[in-house]
């Protein structure tokens, strides 16, 4: 349990560093792009999965 507390402490220090240095705006833009890519892939695989189940039956 202490290990996880230290891991999250280090993550919070890194996030604080990025938040106070102005790098966060660039990282947020990249995160938005990655989010939309992940949503598109999720929907694609969801549709493919539905059609795969229908073709098996």
Curated annotation (Swiss-Prot):
InterPro entries: DUF1328. It is found in: Cell membrane. It is a multi-pass membrane protein. The keyword Cell membrane applies. The keyword Metal-binding does not apply. Its main location: membrane. The chain crosses the membrane at residues 4-24, 33-53. GO terms for cellular component: plasma membrane. This is UPF0391 membrane protein Tbd_2239. It comes from Thiobacillus denitrificans (strain ATCC 25259 / T1). The lineage of its organism: Bacteria, Pseudomonadati, Pseudomonadota, Betaproteobacteria, Nitrosomonadales.
């Amino acid at each position: 349990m202490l290990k996880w507390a230290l891991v999250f402490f280090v993550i919070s220090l890194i996030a604080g560093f990025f938040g106070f240095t102005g790098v966060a705006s660039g990282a947020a833009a990249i995160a938005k792009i990655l989010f939309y890519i992940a949503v598109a892939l999720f929907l694609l695989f969801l549709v493919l999965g539905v059609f795969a189940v229908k073709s098996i039956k």
